Every structure is written in structure tokens, then in C-alpha cells.
């Protein structure tokens, strides 16, 4: 786990060499840097989200006016430590803005949460995020990125697992990024019936 001084600007660690946390770049700090770079959109397709630091970065993106769409596995919405419902409620925090406008957040699941189908279906096991892809390839910019890998957005992944996280960016990678973007949009349309309700 990285020291707070690596994550929070202007925070000074007073423990010095006695600090038990990492003072070097980690998968988590790398992921947070990418999320914090978002200017227009975050399209997140994630099996599980239980790492508060990541959820906080997504919430901060919403406050900056970034449009956020999340697709997740219905079985994990209410799993121990899940941040999905809390993030979903941020969609109601932007009074006067609908999802179709430039900011806000919406969560869709691969099945209705709590249904029999939810308990017996295969998992939606993706772990990728598209940054500043906008509505399509014509909107790609120098800040457009794809994050993908085995890295779950969980405390377990941050503290214990051996995982990988790859980031693709730049025009040379736009074809691969576009493949993931199209896949995300297909799932987004497919799961339209399973929008996670708010205020529950």
C-alpha cells in the first residue's frame, strides 16, 4: 500500500524511514494517476470495486465534471466493502444535470441485483477502464487511455495479490483502444435493463 504522501498532493509523511507504507510508484498510484488525468469521460468495466482510494478518485472525477459510466458484476454490488452503491449515489449529487449531459455517473450491472439469475450466471469478470474516449473515435485525444490487466480494484489486489496493470495511450494504440470502447458500448446497451437504482 502506498504512503498517503504518494497519493495526496502536499501531504508530508512524518514517519520517514519508519513508515510501513511504500514511497514508490505502485499499481495503485499508477491507476490513481490515470483516473485523476480524466478530463471528459471514464468508462469503467470492473468485476469488483472495494478499494476506497480508487472509489474516491472516481468520485473526484465526477466533481470535476467528468462523465462516468460503470459496468459491474451484479453479484458484487453488495459484496463486503463494495463501493459501487456509494458511487451510484453520486449520480444524484449533481442536481440539475442528467446523465445524458456532460457530467454525472450511472452504473449498470450484468443482471438484476439480487435476482435468481444473478446468483447462477457466469461472472462479468472484466477489469478495464477507458479514459477520455468520449462518444467515439472522433473524440479521441492525446489524453485517451485504456487501462487493462488482472488488477482488480480491491484492497486484496492492492495489499496482497500479484497482478498486472497495462496502460495504452497515443494514436498508435487507438485501434486497440477503439476495440475495447466498442465492446464497452455493446455491453452498455445490452445491460440497459439493469441500471442500478438509486436511493436504496
Model-predicted regions and their roles:
Residues 1-37, 48-57, 64-200:
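HKD-type phospholipase D/PLD-like phosphodiesterase module
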Residues 45:
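Short alpha-helical functional segments enriched in proximate histidine and acidic residues
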Amino acid at each position: 500500500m502506498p504512503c498517503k504522501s504518494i497519493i495526496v498532493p502536499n501531504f508530508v509523511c512524518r514517519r520517514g524511514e519508519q513508515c510501513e507504507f511504500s514511497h514508490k510508484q505502485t499499481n495503485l498510484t499508477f491507476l490513481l494517476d490515470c483516473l485523476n488525468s480524466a478530463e471528459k469521460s471514464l468508462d469503467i468495466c470492473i468485476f469488483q470495486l472495494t478499494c476506497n482510494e480508487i472509489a474516491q478518485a472516481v468520485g473526484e472525477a465526477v466533481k470535476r465534471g467528468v462523465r462516468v459510466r460503470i459496468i459491474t458484476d451484479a453479484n458484487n454490488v453488495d459484496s463486503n466493502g463494495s463501493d459501487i452503491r456509494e458511487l451510484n449515489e453520486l449520480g444524484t449529487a449533481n442536481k440539475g444535470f442528467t446523465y445524458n449531459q456532460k457530467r454525472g455517473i450511472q452504473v449498470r450491472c450484468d443482471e438484476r441485483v439480487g435476482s435468481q439469475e444473478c446468483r447462477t450466471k457466469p461472472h462479468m469478470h472484466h477489469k478495464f477502464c477507458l479514459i477520455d474516449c468520449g462518444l467515439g473515435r472522433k473524440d479521441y485525444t492525446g489524453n485517451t487511455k485504456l487501462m487493462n490487466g488482472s488488477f482488480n480494484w480491491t484492497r486484496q489486489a492492492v495489499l496482497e495479490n500479484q497482478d498486472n496493470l497495462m496502460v495504452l495511450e497515443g494514436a498508435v494504440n487507438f485501434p486497440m483502444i477503439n476495440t475495447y470502447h466498442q465492446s464497452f458500448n455493446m455491453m452498455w446497451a445490452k445491460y440497459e435493463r439493469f441500471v442500478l437504482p438509486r436511493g436504496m
